[in-house]
A protein has these predicted regions:
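A short beta-strand-loop-beta hairpin characteristic of the jelly-roll/cupin
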Residues: 55-82, 97
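Short strand-connecting beta-turns/loops that link adjacent beta-strands
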Residues: 27-28, 53, 72, 101-102
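Conserved short histidine dyad/triad with adjacent acidic residue
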Residues: 36-52
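A short, N-terminal "cap"/entry segment at the start of jelly-roll beta-barrel domains
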Residues: 1-33, 47, 121-126
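Conserved hydrophobic/aromatic beta-strand scaffold that supports enzyme active sites
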Residues: 19, 35-39, 57, 77, ...
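Ligand-binding loop in jelly-roll beta-barrel domains
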Residues: 81-82, 90-116
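Histidine-centered metal-chelating micro-motifs
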Residues: 45-47, 66, 85-86, 90-96
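Residue-level recognition of conserved beta-strand positions in structured domain cores
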Residues: 37, 50, 61, 69-71, ...
């Protein structure tokens, strides 16, 4: 068993976005998954991007946002709100915009794991 204290969790951030690295190969013996909690402030955007060799599952836990997708070469959008679940296969383009008035929160499960440090400007551990 592993137990990770909240004080040991790395928090990555960009303007309006915080990503809590709950479980990953840096703080766990698990080599199969990265689990994060992401907070997106009102008006903030996570730009469209992809993960070439990892699938990702997002579980919306609070608020309402807009998925920024690219399906068959066409940029599309889809409402994503608390209770919804979405799975992105390897290479699926995805992002998120918070058009709501409150913080949007989701849990992300990524396999195989990714070190998301490359995508964020700040870390509470650096």
């Amino acid at each position: 068993m592993e137990f990770i204290k909240n004080t040991e969790i790395e928090v990555l951030s960009n303007p309006g976005v915080e990503s809590f690295q709950l479980l990953n190969p840096k703080n766990s013996d698990s080599r199969r998954v990265t689990i994060t909690k992401v907070l997106v402030q009102s008006g903030a955007i996570q730009p469209r991007h992809l993960h070439e060799t990892s699938e990702q599952i997002w579980i919306a836990t609070k608020g309402k946002g807009v998925l920024l997708l690219c399906e068959n070469g066409t940029e599309t959008e889809r409402t994503f709100e608390s209770g919804d679940v979405v799975r992105f296969a390897d290479g699926d383009i995805h992002g998120l915009r918070n058009d709501g008035q409150e913080v949007f929160e989701y849990i992300s499960v990524t396999s195989p794991p990714i070190d998301f440090g490359y995508a964020y400007k700040k870390s509470n551990k650096k």
